[in-house]
Swiss-Prot record:
Name of the coding gene: surE
Protein's cellular compartments: Cytoplasm
Predominant subcellular localization, coarse grouping: cytoplasm
InterPro entries listed in its UniProt record: SurE, SurE-like_Pase/nucleotidase, SurE-like_sf
Family, per entry: Belongs to the SurE nucleotidase family.
Source organism: Paramagnetospirillum magneticum (strain ATCC 700264 / AMB-1)
Function: Nucleotidase that shows phosphatase activity on nucleoside 5'-monophosphates.
Protein name per its UniProtKB record: 5'-nucleotidase SurE
Catalysed conversion reaction: a ribonucleoside 5'-phosphate + H2O = a ribonucleoside + phosphate
GO MF annotation, one: metal ion binding
Keyword field: Cytoplasm, Hydrolase, Metal-binding, Nucleotide-binding
Record text on cofactor binding: Binds 1 divalent metal cation per subunit.
Length: 260
């Protein structure tokens, strides 16, 4: 089963969320992008930054949904909470036709997708039966974020994806390179790459001498494998990666049958 192609997105109801929070610059960029596609745009996003929240759901405390302004709501929860409440609470009278998540400040490549709240928000939309796209703008420190790149290219990428359609159990993960818009080398369909594991744990001590730790966020990328999201983005291309939330490894499933 596939989502039907959409030649003209102007009639779509679009729900936007993210993991950087409702006041993040990236979500404002995504709002502008979405309004080039349709005028029926809604935002339901976390009240505060939820980076690396993954696909977590808040079930041990009540959640508050605060109306920020017309068609903009903040949730004191995770990106997954925000999409779930956006679809089944804020927009329960007329559910969205498309979920857009982002624009994330920084890439979501390789194993990043398992931690990413940006990808998780799109995953929740997919689980709820709605086409969903996660969008991230790659950032290489100390460069400023090139929001102009994603704002220039994203409308065309989204329109092309909608015109084609994709499978109902699939979300689309799009990463934009850390180059100016004019230097983008193209749009490429890619597979998920693999980052080299980074085990950086930084130990510090507070004024009372008690130890605490930070988990290092940096991972080394393997940029050498053609066809991956990592290789494409660091070559200056936009990567478009279809992701499936069915994590079953069917070859090992068959192999393990002989153990029981």
């Amino acid at each position: 089963m596939t989502f039907p192609p959409v030649a003209d997105p102007s009639s779509l109801r679009i729900l936007i969320s993210n993991d950087d929070g409702i006041n993040a610059p990236g979500i404002k960029v995504l709002e502008r992008i979405a309004r080039t596609l349709s005028k029926d745009v809604w935002v339901v996003a976390p009240e505060t930054e939820q980076s690396a929240a993954g696909h977590s759901l808040t079930i041990r405390r009540p959640l508050r949904v605060r109306k920020v302004s017309a068609r903009r709501y903040a949730v004191d929860g995770t990106p997954t909470d925000s999409v779930l409440l956006g679809v089944n609470h804020v927009l329960k009278g007329k559910k969205p036709d498309l979920v857009l998540s982002g624009i994330n400040r920084g890439a979501n490549l390789g194993e990043d997708v398992t931690y990413s709240g940006t990808v998780a928000a799109a995953m929740e939309g997919t689980i709820l039966g709605i086409p969903a796209i996660a969008l991230s703008q790659t950032l290489e420190h100390p460069h400023p974020v090139k929001w102009g790149t994603v704002e220039h290219w994203a409308p065309d990428v989204i329109r092309r994806l909608l015109a084609k359609g994709w499978s109902r159990n699939v979300l689309i993960n799009v990463n934009f390179p850390d180059v100016i818009a004019a230097s983008v080398t193209g749009i490429e369909i890619t597979r998920q790459g693999k980052r080299k594991i980074g085990d950086e744990i930084m130990e510090r001590h507070d004024p009372r001498g008690e130890a605490y730790v930070w988990i290092g966020a940096q991972r080394a990328e393997d940029r050498s494998k053609p066809g991956t999201d990592i290789e494409a983005v660091f070559r200056g291309a936009i990567s478009v990666t279809p992701l499936c939330f069915d994590l079953t490894h069917r070859d090992d499933m068959k192999a393990l049958e002989t153990a029981f």
